[in-house]
Amino acid sequence: MSTPGPVPSSTSVATLPFSAQDKTQEQVSEELQSVGIYQDLERYEETIQQLSKSVDTFKPDLSLIDKVIECDKKLYETLEEFDEYYKIEEELSRLDKEQKNIDNKTREILETLNTCYNSLNELPMLEQVEFEQKVMLKQREKIHSKVVLDYAMKLAKFTRFPPTFDKSMIGPNNFIWPAEDSLRKGMLAMASLKKKELLLDALDEDNVNNDNNTSKIDEMRNTNEDSVDDRFNNKEQVQDATEDTERRGSFEFTANGKEDSETKSEENPDLELDLDLDLFNPDEF
């Protein structure tokens, strides 16, 4: 009677797929190998393979069964740690989301910083702006008013008049400044808008002028009175002096009375006329 050969059993442990992707130990990453449960699974797999080989060769090894039991106990112990691994996985997923959010925010910040940097580069430097301002001020100082007026005349002659321009307005239409009539109208309009202020200013000026005039009139009156008194006194002194001289001349007797009379008649022709009159006849006496 011949012994039967090894028949593959459907329940053989060697035929079970230990991993869905049938990865070898070399293909597994080092990070996965560092996990304790993965090492226990590998050890459990190796012992089961050895046991299956011994059973297939009809030489079972009982020590392998003890190893399988030990590996099974370790697997149960590591399975109890799955709760911690689950928590760790949740924490990792949360950190991944947070990292993504931070990455998005940092990307947005970098984009805004880049746009700000570009806009700042487009702007001129402070030193350049100050230099340009100084140059412009120097150029403005050099420009003469006549040049500005000539340029304004050119603009006024060759540009269109505004739609609110009054064609019936008197004055030069080609000038950019208004005519004299429009200036007067503007002054009258401003005066009509500020009636009260102008009236109050005028009244204040009139009051001040009246006070000054009254003081001047009083001074003039006082000076006139003083001058009249002085003149009256001078006239009295002159009259007194003339009376004294006339009186003194009537009592003077000179030897050459004829010569004196002739000199007096030469000096005053009116006296000569009086002497020529025959007011009385000396023969009658």
Curated annotation (Swiss-Prot):
Domain of life of the source: Eukaryota
The primary location reported for this protein is nucleus
Compositional bias (Low complexity): 1-13
Region ranges (Disordered) = 1-25, 206-285
Q: Which GO molecular function terms does the record list?
A: transcription coregulator activity
Write out the GO cellular component annotations: core mediator complex; mediator complex
Keywords attached to this entry: Activator, Coiled coil, Nucleus, Transcription, Transcription regulation
Bias-annotated ranges (Acidic residues): 268-285
- Where found, per UniProt? Nucleus
The entry assigns this protein to a family as follows: Belongs to the Mediator complex subunit 4 family.
Q: What role is this protein assigned?
A: Component of the Mediator complex, a coactivator involved in the regulated transcription of nearly all RNA polymerase II-dependent genes. Mediator functions as a bridge to convey information from gene-specific regulatory proteins to the basal RNA polymerase II transcription machinery. Mediator is recruited to promoters by direct interactions with regulatory proteins and serves as a scaffold for the assembly of a functional preinitiation complex with RNA polymerase II and the general transcription factors.
* Assembly and interaction partners: Component of the Mediator complex.
Full protein name: Mediator of RNA polymerase II transcription subunit 4
Encoded by which gene?
MED4
